[in-house]
Amino acid sequence: VEPLAAALEIPSQVHLSPEKNVAIIGDGRLALMIAQVVSLYGVDLTIIGKHEDKLKKFEKLGKTRHIDGETYEVVIDATGSPGGMEMAQNIVRKRGTIVLKSTYAGNLNLNMSYFVVNEITIVGSRCGPFEPALNLLNRGLVELPEIELWDLRDYEKAFASHSFKSGFKFPV
């Protein structure tokens, strides 16, 4: 439920409406939760990811192809890697907003004057409300990604599983 609650923090921080052009960078579990929440607002949504198999899960929520040169009013970085912020900087419109859902180890090397000159707002976004997340689940408005459950004694099988190799988190 936590990734869904984190996704629900975004609409409390950024105004979303049908006329907004929004991009989500990332194709993992958190990005999937964010895409489901953001799509409830009727935005023009594009999901940008590197894994064709993962992007198939997003097709009913928005476009899964970024067109070179296209820019967005709101860009949400859910990659977990510094390259996500670099891409966000390249595709956000002037006077647009970048929402950072990623936490990076170490520092990013950014030219901050670019954000000032182009009047780009950067919003840090972390945890969110659990009760509304549970409400969305109970009403069937969002679906949680499939997870694999493992007994602790089967930890070797868990680490050898497809979910671990594909970068999805799972409880042991």
What residue spans do the PLM features occupy?
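A general structural signal for well-ordered alpha-helical segments in protein cores
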Residues: 4-7, 31, 72, 85, ...
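Rossmann-like dinucleotide-binding domain for NAD(H)/NADP(H)
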Residues: 122-123, 136
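Mid-domain Rossmann-like dinucleotide-binding core that forms the NAD(H)/NADP(H) cofactor-binding site
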Residues: 1-69
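Structural detector of well-ordered beta-strand residues that form the stable sheet scaffold
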Residues: 46, 97-100, 123, 167
